[in-house]
Amino acid sequence: VNSGASTAQSKLIHDNVTKTLLSTVNLYMIDLSITNELPSQYALEEVRIKKYDANRTDQFADHVDVGDHNSARRFLAFFLYLTENQFEGQTNFTYLDLSIDPKPGRILVFPPLWLFPHAGMPVGKSEKYIVGSYCHYL
């Protein structure tokens, strides 16, 4: 999405978002007491922005993010919420009976595998924006 930002500004934003997402890998490892389970070398896939339109049924149905050979290198998913949508637009984890409320700056990190099907719920009065990406094996 280009809102008039220069190429230099866009690169700076991209670099900062990438750095922020990658820094959460260490926090994730600390929170889960992971020491050697994740690869020592990995990369971040391209960063994507998803817009959920207001007052619609715009949503992502229950799914997993690793479902074929092309996506099989993914081992962590990242959602950086850019907007607050109180009581709507949650990310729901079906088997965990868990809903994550979108709040600006909140980063959700989880394995994108079959154990963690999730859905992006529709929003009501206001649009929802998230930045998403994946860590993958090199």
PLM region spans:
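Fe(II)/2-oxoglutarate oxygenase catalytic core
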Residues: 1-107, 115-138
